[in-house]
A protein has these predicted regions:
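N-terminal lobe/hinge region of extracytoplasmic solute-binding protein
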Residues: 56-116, 147, 222
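Gly/Pro-rich hinge or "lid" segments in bacterial periplasmic/extracellular proteins
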Residues: 78, 86-89, 94-101, 194-265, ...
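Aromatic- and charge-enriched surface segment that lines or borders ligand/interaction sites
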Residues: 109-155, 171, 177-179, 275-278, ...
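Ligand-site clamp/hinge motif
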Residues: 126, 215, 247-300, 341, ...
Length: 646
C-alpha cells in the first residue's frame, strides 16, 4: 500500500508539471463537471487537423502498430482494434452486451433453419447497405467471402471452413442458402458475434476478386460501417476515421437512425503515465485499459473523468474473457500434464493477484471467466466437484480458502472495512477459490517425469539442461496481462525455474500465439458471456491443431485431448436452451481443469475511464445501455449514442 500511495503521489506531482506545459491542442480547464453542464470549448484543433469538439479520441488499446497499412482481416497479427473492426467492418449478427443476445446487423433477421436437423439455413441480408465507395452489399459479397475461405488453404480460417461448411448458394440478391456438414443449431453464434468479434468479415467482391487474400493488405480499406478511413500514422501510432456522408446506408444507420461524432481518432501516446496525463489534459476521451493506481490519479486530478462506476471499485469486473498463462501444449515439456499442473501448483496466486492489480481481481479455476452470469451457472455449482477432484496420484489440488485469505490480507492493510460482510458476498467479489500453492507437490510431479534439481535448487530438464521459461506478454497494452506475466514469473523463479518475461508489440504477440511459436504466454483464451459457453470454447477441439509455425484456425494452444473432443462433439449437437447444454458444459470444464489445458487465473478487471469535456452519454453502470467495451465490434452502436457537449 505504501508503494502504491508513493506512486500516486509521484504521478500527481508529475501531472501538475506536464499539464501546466500542455500543448494547446486541448484545454486543461474544461469548464464543466462530470454532470455535463457547460458547453465544450470550440475552436480547438487536434494534431491531425480536425476540430477537437467534433473528434472523439480513443486510446489505442494495442499500442503502436508494426504494420499500420495492413487491413487484411484474415492475416495473422493484423491489428483489428484501432477502429477497424469497431466502426469500419460489420457483421451479419452482432451482440447486445446488456442482454447477451444476438441481433441482426448486416443480416435482416436471424438465420432461418430450413430443416429439423439444423444443417441448412436461409440468411436474409439487410437491403440498402453500401460499401463506402458506393457499391451495394449483396449476397455476391457473402458468397465470395465463403468461397475464398474454402479455396485458400493458406488462410487460417480454411481449416474451420472445410470442416463446418458443406455448400452455399445465392438464392437472390439478398438471400443466401447456407448448408453445414453436420447439425449446427448455433449457426448464428458460429458466424456472428458473441463477444469481441466473429469469424465472418465480409469481403467486398469488387475489391478482392483480383487479389491474393493471403498477401493483399487491403489498403486503404473500403468500409461497410458508418465511418470511412481517413488516414493513418506511418509509424503506427494513430488512425483517423471520418463519418460517411451516407451513414444512413449502414446497419447502424438503419437500426439506430443515429451516427456518431464526425471524426474518431485512435491514438497511442505511449506509456501508461503519458496516457493518464493525456486524459488529465483532455487530450483523450476514452482510455481502454489502465491500472487501479492510475484510476486513483485520475479521480484526484480531474473532475470531468469517471469510470464504469463513479466511485470505488471503479472497474467493471464482468469482461467476458479471463487471464492466465497459456502454453504450446504440442511442444516439450508443456505437452505433459504433470508439467502444466506443477506450474499451477508453483504459482502463489494470492501474491500474483496483489502484484497484478493490488488484489482487485476475481479468481477462476475454470476455463471460462468468473463473470456474474457464468459464475452462477458453473463456478459456484462446481465447487463440490472441484473439491472432490484428484490427480492420478490421489492428490486433491483445490483450495477454497482463497476468499478468506484475501479478505484477511485487505484487513491487515487497513482497507477491510470496504469489504462485504458475508462469505457469499466475498465469493461474488473474489471468486470460489483456486489451486493450492504447494511447491512440494509441484516438485513431485516434475520429478515423476524426469526433472531434477541442481545444487543451487534450480530445475533441470530430463536431459540435464537448465529449464528456462520465457513468457510472452503485452507491452504497453492490456496492462493486466502484462503485469500478470511478471507476477507469475516471480513465483516460478522462487520455485527454481529460470522464468522471464518477453514484452511484445501487438502484432508479434498475436502472431506468435496464432502460429504457436511461443512456449508460454500471458494470453486469454477462455471466454464466455452466459450459460451457453460452447460457441466460445469450440475452438479447443483437437481437430483444429496444426503444426507449430502454421496459423491455427482454432486451438492455438495445440492441446490434444480425446476426452475434451468427445464432449465437444456432443455439445455441438444440442441447442442453447437444451438442459443437456449446462450438464455437458460442466463436464467439459471439469475435464479441462483436470488436464490443465492452460492455467486460468483471474477474470478481467477493466478500468476504462471516460472524459466528459467534449462528449457525454457514455455507457456507465448507471447509464447501462451497453457495456464499456470500446474495443468490441459493437462499438459502432455505442458511438452512435455518444453525444457532443452542447
Amino acid at each position: 500500500m505504501k508503494h502504491r500511495q508513493w506512486l500516486i503521489a509521484v504521478l500527481v506531482v508529475f501531472s501538475l508539471v506536464v499539464s501546466a506545459c500542455a500543448a494547446p491542442a486541448a484545454p486543461t480547464d474544461s469548464g464543466a463537471g462530470s454532470d455535463g453542464g457547460a458547453a465544450a470549448p470550440a475552436g480547438e484543433m487536434t494534431f491531425v487537423g480536425t476540430p477537437r469538439n467534433e473528434t472523439l479520441i480513443l486510446d489505442n488499446l494495442n499500442g503502436s502498430l508494426e504494420r499500420p497499412e495492413n487491413f487484411n482481416p484474415y492475416t495473422p497479427g493484423v491489428e483489428m482494434g484501432r477502429g477497424y473492426h469497431e466502426i469500419c467492418l460489420d457483421n451479419l449478427w452482432d451482440v447486445d452486451t446488456v442482454t447477451g443476445e444476438q441481433f441482426p446487423a448486416l443480416a435482416a433477421e436471424m438465420p432461418t433453419p430450413l430443416n429439423d436437423d439444423y444443417t441448412s439455413f436461409e440468411i436474409k441480408l439487410r437491403e440498402g447497405i453500401y460499401w463506402d465507395d458506393g457499391v451495394e452489399f449483396t449476397s455476391d459479397d457473402v458468397i465470395f467471402t465463403l468461397q475464398t475461405w474454402m479455396d485458400t488453404e493458406a488462410l487460417a480460417i480454411h481449416g474451420w471452413a472445410v470442416d463446418y461448411i458443406a455448400s452455399f448458394e445465392a438464392v437472390d440478391k439478398y438471400t443466401v442458402q447456407f448448408n453445414t456438414t453436420r447439425p449446427q443449431p448455433r449457426m448464428a453464434k458460429d458466424l456472428g458475434v458473441t463477444i469481441w468479434d466473429n469469424r465472418f468479415y465480409p469481403m467486398a467482391k469488387h475489391i478482392w476478386e483480383n487479389q491474393d487474400p493471403t498477401t493483399y493488405e487491403y489498403f486503404p480499406p473500403v468500409c461497410i460501417g458508418q465511418y470511412k478511413f481517413s488516414k493513418t500514422d506511418p509509424n503506427g501510432n494513430w488512425t483517423l476515421w471520418e463519418l460517411r456522408d451516407d451513414w444512413e446506408r449502414t446497419s447502424v444507420g438503419q437500426i439506430t437512425e443515429k451516427s456518431g461524432p464526425k471524426y474518431i481518432l485512435w491514438n497511442f501516446v505511449g506509456t501508461e503515465e503519458k496516457r493518464i496525463l493525456a486524459m488529465i489534459a483532455n487530450d483523450v476521451d476514452i482510455l481502454q485499459d489502465i491500472t487501479p493506481e492510475s484510476m486513483e490519479v485520475l479521480t484526484q486530478r480531474s473532475d470531468v473523468v469517471r469510470a464504469w462506476h463513479a466511485g470505488f471499485p471503479y472497474a467493471d469486473f464482468d469482461d467476458p474473457c479471463e487471464r492466465g498463462i497459456s502454453f504450446n501444449n504440442s511442444e516439450f515439456p508443456y505437452d505433459q500434464w504433470q508439467v502444466r499442473w506443477a506450474l499451477a501448483l508453483a504459482t502463489d496466486i494470492k501474491n500474483v493477484s496483489l502484484g497484478t492489480f493490488a488484489g482487485m481481481l476475481r479468481v477462476s479455476p475454470l476455463g471460462v471467466p468468473p463473470v456474474a452470469a457464468v459464475q452462477k451457472v458453473y463456478h459456484k455449482p462446481l465447487v463440490e466437484r472441484l473439491q472432490a477432484m484428484t490427480l492420478p496420484d490421489g492428490y486433491a489440488p483445490f483450495d477454497s480458502s482463497f476468499v478468506l485469505d484475501m479478505a484477511k490480507i485487505f484487513q491487515e492493510q487497513g482497507v477491510g472495512g470496504d469489504l462485504p460482510a458475508t462469505d457469499a458476498e466475498l465469493i461474488d467479489l473474489f471468486g470460489v477459490g483456486w489451486w493450492k500453492y504447494d511447491t512440494e507437490q509441484a516438485a513431485k510431479l516434475l520429478e515423476d517425469v524426469g526433472f531434477t534439481r541442481n545444487a543451487d535448487g534450480k530445475w533441470l530438464l530430463p536431459d540435464g539442461t537448465p529449464w528456462s521459461i520465457s513468457i510472452n506478454a503485452p507491452s504497453d497494452f492490456e496492462v493486466q496481462s502484462g503485469r500478470l506475466a511478471y507476477a507469475v514469473a516471480d513465483s516460478w523463479s522462487k520455485f527454481g525455474i529460470d522464468a522471464s518475461v518477453k514484452p511484445m508489440t501487438a502484432n508479434t504477440f498475436w502472431t506468435e500465439q496464432a502460429t504457436g511459436q511461443f512456449e508460454a504466454g500471458s494470453y486469454w483464451p477462455g471466454c464466455a458471456i452466459g450459460a451457453d459457453i460452447y460457441p466460445n470454447l469450440s475452438g479447443w477441439h483437437q481437430k483444429f491443431i496444426v503444426p507449430t509455425g502454421e496459423p491455427a484456425p482454432g486451438n492455438v494452444n495445440r492441446h490434444a485431448s480425446d476426452e475434451i473432443a468427445a464432449i465437444m462433439d456432443e455439445l455441438e449437437k444440442v441447442t442453447s436452451n437444451d438442459p443437456r447444454n449446462v450438464e455437458l458444459s460442466s463436464d467439459l470444464l471439469m475435464q479441462m481443469a483436470l488436464e490443465m489445458h492452460w492455467i486460468p487465473m483471474f477474470g478481467t478487471s477493466k478500468f476504462v475511464p471516460v472524459n466528459e469535456t467534449y462528449f457525454t452519454n457514455y455507457p456507465t453502470a448507471d447509464n447501462y445501455y451497453e457495456g464499456p467495451w470500446w474495443w468490441w465490434s459493437n462499438f459502432k452502436f455505442i458511438v452512435a449514442n455518444i453525444q457532443p457537449k452542447q
